[in-house]
């Protein structure tokens, strides 16, 4: 089997290297004869090891097991106390330890002082500013590096260069840590005061980042970048990432476009051989020079030198180095500040009376008009979502914090919880539930705060508002978003598009007579000057809308929404500062409202329109596109003459002056060839993404387990790899080995094998081959998948107790009664299941389920029990199909040019042969008629799983289902009797299968699955009309071909002669596919 098991075995010998250590392999087989031998083999191994005998003779005797059975897990057994890390580390600590510059950062606590200098006592101490927030320890990370170094110490040629580079960097890390001793973590993977008091406060998070960086070093340039970042980030914990990545916003404006991709009328990318010259005024070069000087002032040498050298000819070929530096800068780790500083940062802005009130006025009116435009149609038509807004809000109520911990009673059980959903249930049960009253957030009841940490930026605060705010805003915001969905200005929400579409939009209109203006408005969004005009614009819009309807329910919805805006104009926040909780009047907009994203986009669109209308007073141009995307906005302006240096400089200065008239602290730039925004940047006509996801430090602690985090780690590694930042795969696998191991007792540990972690079961963590999702079809794979399915659904006593309490039942019944016109088991059960699932975020429930799962897993990893299941997985379907396919060699030539230079070669090759796609494949069922019919009459949104179940019911039952959701019997009858219904069956099945096959994740989201080049490699004779079967055969063939091409860099063609008799069987099976959720699929989802 694969490389993983080999690494696993070597890693165990490396870690448990004493005389007493034993490794016992555990095998399994789906063949009952061989399975008996497996069990015998295991028993004898355990026996021999107890007697201290060698296992070698057994390996000979049971060669049949080792050759033919599948490795299930490794049992490792060692008496040794585990201080091996320190012993091994000494051998690498040959260098000079780093000394922190204690004046490098403005805020005292951001300096890397000895912990006891920052915190006098254990009571004062907090780890929140340096907590790696990941369920793996520094000692494990050190072990993983030393294991890699030992394994590769005899490498030759180029591999030896990599070894030497990494060894050199690790010497810095090892020497520094060795000086203070390795900090020991507690059972929650946190570092306590006792451990940290005599060590530098940021030692752990710095070491994690450094290890992540040094294990991503391959070339000499990587080495120089990493060395500089590792050394400087030891002292500079505040501005380093920002300094290093700042120049990028200008660099993108310096490269000529010589051939690019543009979006055509069909929303596809097509190549255009246009040439656009980069026109750069001297002023811009001066600004860039200033940035480079700032880097040098901060002690950087090699990185500014690389940028300076690139500036000589600004070539696109060498730009990959610039994009590398930009990505690397994020890997210095998160900047975590104290809440008080994060909050005051936004309040420090000087308020000046000297602002252009006319512009503010225009800005407010634009916001008002946009709100009206977005909501006009639903309001005039008395849309049911706006009428039943409260119910809609309750159905999608999150289980996030409600800001305070309360004591709640569920039946006989008393619970302390902060969760919104639980508070709602409790309030309803005690008659305290008043959604018509929006609680005040003024000085008597200040808002508690959450935080958001990002590398290279300051910490931002998040409002944790009472659930009434969510209910009041939910329905209206949903309507705003569905408007934004078909409005191209809103790049983030535009229907099923992905970032490639936005890229083609920009390049499409670039030419010698256009310039593109791009602005980062993140400062503006959270500035005080924004809040009054912003909220007032929304309020004025809502007032106009209220006059467009006579429906009291719609008016009520709009009024409650308006009330949230009024309350938030006078908001106070509570900030813990040491032991006191400070109340501060906070006059700015913060995240945390349901409307945050939508409203910010509206405001940013209004802002750029205001700016453009001022510019239009002075210049004559046509605005070709305006886009807002999160905190950024950009516009392409077309002039009637060719653009000159002087023009670019004038427009640039005018734009900046206009922003300053509104006292908006934004970074506005003008270029003729490229843009840089938070999500992506375009340079030389190509698109780039920042590969800045931290692997060994996390932003915050959630309730994910080690297995989940191992899957997230792998998923982050894959995303970075696609974006051009590659970490050594062996290192990632070693981390997975560490994070998925399960302790049985102090000296006994169980390590799952590759088969367990890569089969798509409920325990899947990674793919055996990067970018390729395999669906095992061999006997052993299907066997293990069945086994795991049997133990995935663990019960939780606490959850059952809550769910059987009157409080919970009443709540679910209340929702069902409000929602349903007539009783319907499917829907009621659906609601109950959803509500019960929300309890999972309550820690005790989660832990209980997890414990049960781990103990079941432990049993299973030692001796799998065969399990007869009537559940069918996607693997079963593919297994039925596979035998009918015949493979032959084929040839596809490269015919598309590169547009995403950072892609790994094998993925790039596939795209160049079959092309890319600019849209998301619909995998939610929302495009089906039944889904549209339901949303026309009801606020209920069935999941793809539920639609898939419903659509395969008998027609009578489908009709009842629809009627119970408020669809008029006539419409329901018409639907079931029409052709649309049979089309829907196909549509929903298609969506469901796409969803199961993760077609919108990983690198599959980049490939054009409908490529004619791909189609011509597949030959399937047409027999009978079962479109669903044809669909699955084709999709299987496409995935097979693409996976083969990614792996081997060559093409195959497939012929399938599927017997007609089997088709009906397959079709029936296809209506019983069970969806599998695993840490792996959750991690994919988490990436979204």
From Swiss-Prot:
MF (Gene Ontology): nucleotide binding; RNA binding; RNA-directed RNA polymerase activity
Protein name in the entry: RNA-directed RNA polymerase
Location(s), subcellular: Virion
InterPro entries xref list: DNA/RNA_pol_sf, RNA-dir_pol_4-hel_dom, RNA-dir_pol_luteovirus, RNA-dir_pol_reovirus, Rotavirus_VP1_C
Protein EC: 2.7.7.48
A Pfam family assignment: RdRP_4
Subunit structure: Interacts with VP3 (Potential). Interacts with VP2; this interaction activates VP1. Interacts with NSP5; this interaction is probably necessary for the formation of functional virus factories. Interacts with NSP2; this interaction is weak.
Cofactor(s) named in the record: Mg(2+)
Protein task: RNA-directed RNA polymerase that is involved in both transcription and genome replication. Together with VP3 capping enzyme, forms an enzyme complex positioned near the channels situated at each of the five-fold vertices of the core. Following infection, the outermost layer of the virus is lost, leaving a double-layered particle (DLP) made up of the core and VP6 shell. VP1 then catalyzes the transcription of fully conservative plus-strand genomic RNAs that are extruded through the DLP's channels into the cytoplasm where they function as mRNAs for translation of viral proteins.
GO cellular component: virion component
Similarity comment: family membership: Belongs to the reoviridae RNA-directed RNA polymerase family.
């Amino acid at each position: 089997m694969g490389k993983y098991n080999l690494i696993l075995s070597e890693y165990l010998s490396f870690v448990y290297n004493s005389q007493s250590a034993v490794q016992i392999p555990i095998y399994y087989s789906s063949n009952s004869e061989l399975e008996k031998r497996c069990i015998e083999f295991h028993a004898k191994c355990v026996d021999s090891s107890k007697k201290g005998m060698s296992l070698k003779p057994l390996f000979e005797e049971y060669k049949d097991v080792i050759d033919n059975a599948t490795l299930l897990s490794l049992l490792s057994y060692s008496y040794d106390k585990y201080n091996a890390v320190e012993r091994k580390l000494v051998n690498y600590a040959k260098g000079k330890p780093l000394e922190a510059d204690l004046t490098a950062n403005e805020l005292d606590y951001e300096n890397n002082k000895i912990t006891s200098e920052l915190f006098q006592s254990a009571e004062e101490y907090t780890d929140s500013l340096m907590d790696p927030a990941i369920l793996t320890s520094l000692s494990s990370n050190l072990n993983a590096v030393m294991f890699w170094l030992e394994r590769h110490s005899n490498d030759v040629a180029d591999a030896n260069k990599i070894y030497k580079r990494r060894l050199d960097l690790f010497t810095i890390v090892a020497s520094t840590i060795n000086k203070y001793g390795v900090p020991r973590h507690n059972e929650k993977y946190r570092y306590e005061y006792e451990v940290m008091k005599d060590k530098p406060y940021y030692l752990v998070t710095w070491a994690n980042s450094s290890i992540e960086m040094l294990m991503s070093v391959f070339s000499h340039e990587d080495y120089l970048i990493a060395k500089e970042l590792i050394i400087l980030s030891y002292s500079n914990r505040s501005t380093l990432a920002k300094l290093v990545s700042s120049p990028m916003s200008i660099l993108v404006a310096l490269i000529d476009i010589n051939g690019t991709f543009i979006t055509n009328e069909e929303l596809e990318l097509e190549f255009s051989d246009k040439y656009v010259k980069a026109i750069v005024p001297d002023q811009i070069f001066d600004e860039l020079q200033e940035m480079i000087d700032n880097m040098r002032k901060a002690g950087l040498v090699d990185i500014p030198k690389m940028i300076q050298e690139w500036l000589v000819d600004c070539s696109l070929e060498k730009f990959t180095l610039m994009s590398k530096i930009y990505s690397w800068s994020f890997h210095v780790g998160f900047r975590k500040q104290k809440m008080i500083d994060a909050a005051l940062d936004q309040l420090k802005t000087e308020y000046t009376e000297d602002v252009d009130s006319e512009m503010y006025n225009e800005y407010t009116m634009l916001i008002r008009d946009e709100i009206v435009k977005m909501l006009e149609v639903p309001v005039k038509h008395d849309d049911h979502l706006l009428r039943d807004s409260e119910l809609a809000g309750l159905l999608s109520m999150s289980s996030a914090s409600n800001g305070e911990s309360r004591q709640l009673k569920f039946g006989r059980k008393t619970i302390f919880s902060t969760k919104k959903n639980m508070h709602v249930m409790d309030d309803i049960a005690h008659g305290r539930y008043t959604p018509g009253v929006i609680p005040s957030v003024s000085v008597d009841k200040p808002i508690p705060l959450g935080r958001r940490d990002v590398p290279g930026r300051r910490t931002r605060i998040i409002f944790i508002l009472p659930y009434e705010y969510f209910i009041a805003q939910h329905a209206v915001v949903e309507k705003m978003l569905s408007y934004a969905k078909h409005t191209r200005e809103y790049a983030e929400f535009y229907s099923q598009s992905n970032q490639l579409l936005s890229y083609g939009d920009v390049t499409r209109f670039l030419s010698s007579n256009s310039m593109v203006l791009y602005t980062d408005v993140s400062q503006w969004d959270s500035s005080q000057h924004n809040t009054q005009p912003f909220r007032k614009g929304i309020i004025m819009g809502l007032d106009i809308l209220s006059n467009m309807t006579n429906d009291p329910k719609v008016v009520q919805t709009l009024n409650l929404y308006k009330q949230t805006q009024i309350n938030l104009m006078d908001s106070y926040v509570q900030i813990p500062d040491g032991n006191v909780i400070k109340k501060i009047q906070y006059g700015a907009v913060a995240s945390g409202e349901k409307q945050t994203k939508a409203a910010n986009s509206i405001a940013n669109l209004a802002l750029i329109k205001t700016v453009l209308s001022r510019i239009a007073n002075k210049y004559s141009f046509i605005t070709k596109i305006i886009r807002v995307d999160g905190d950024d906005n950009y516009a392409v302006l077309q002039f009637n003459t060719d653009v000159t240096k002087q023009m670019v400089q004038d427009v640039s200065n005018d734009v900046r002056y206009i922003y300053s008239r509104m006292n908006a602290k934004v970074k506005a730039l003008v270029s003729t060839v490229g843009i840089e925004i938070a999500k992506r940047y375009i340079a030389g006509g190509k698109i780039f993404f920042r590969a800045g996801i931290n692997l060994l430090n996390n932003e915050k602690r959630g309730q994910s387990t080690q297995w989940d985090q191992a899957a997230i780690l792998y998923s982050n590694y894959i995303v970075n790899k696609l974006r051009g930042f590659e970490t050594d795969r062996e290192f990632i696998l070693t981390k997975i080995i560490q994070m998925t191991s399960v302790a049985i007792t102090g000296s006994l540990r169980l390590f799952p094998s590759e088969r367990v972690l890569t089969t798509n079961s409920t325990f899947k963590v990674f793919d055996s081959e990067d970018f390729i999702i395999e669906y095992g079809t061999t006997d052993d794979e299907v066997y293990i998948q069945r086994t795991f399915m049997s133990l995935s659904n663990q019960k939780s006593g606490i959850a059952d107790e809550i769910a059987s309490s009157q409080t919970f039942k009443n709540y679910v019944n209340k929702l069902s009664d409000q929602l349903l016109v007539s009783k319907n088991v499917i829907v009621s059960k659906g609601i109950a299941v959803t509500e019960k699932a929300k309890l999972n975020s309550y820690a005790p429930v989660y832990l209980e389920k997890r414990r049960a799962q781990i103990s079941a897993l432990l049993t299973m990893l030692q001796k799998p029990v065969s399990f007869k299941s009537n559940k069918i997985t996607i693997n079963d379907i593919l297994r039925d199909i596979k035998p009918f396919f015949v493979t032959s060699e084929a040839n596809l030539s490269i015919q598309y040019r590169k547009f995403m230079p950072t892609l790994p070669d094998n993925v790039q090759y596939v795209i160049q042969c079959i092309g890319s796609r600019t849209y998301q494949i619909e995998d939610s069922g929302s495009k089906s008629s039944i889904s549209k019919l339901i949303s026309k009459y009801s606020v209920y949104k069935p999941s793809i799983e539920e639609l898939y179940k419903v659509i395969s019911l008998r027609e009578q039952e489908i009709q009842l289902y629809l009627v119970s959701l408020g669809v008029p019997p006539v419409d329901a009858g018409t639907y079931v009797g029409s052709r649309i219904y049979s089309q829907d069956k196909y549509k929903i099945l298609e969506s469901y299968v796409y969803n199961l096959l993760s077609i919108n994740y990983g690198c599959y989201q980049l490939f054009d699955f409908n490529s004619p080049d791909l189609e011509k490699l597949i030959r399937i004779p047409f027999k009978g009309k079962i479109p669903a079967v044809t669909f699955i055969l084709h999709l299987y063939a496409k995935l097979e071909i693409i996976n083969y091409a990614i792996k081997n860099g060559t093409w195959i063609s497939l012929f399938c002669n599927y017997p007609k008799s089997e088709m009906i069987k397959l079709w029936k099976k296809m209506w019983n596919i069970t969806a599998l959720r695993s840490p792996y699929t959750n991690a994919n989802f988490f990436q979204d």
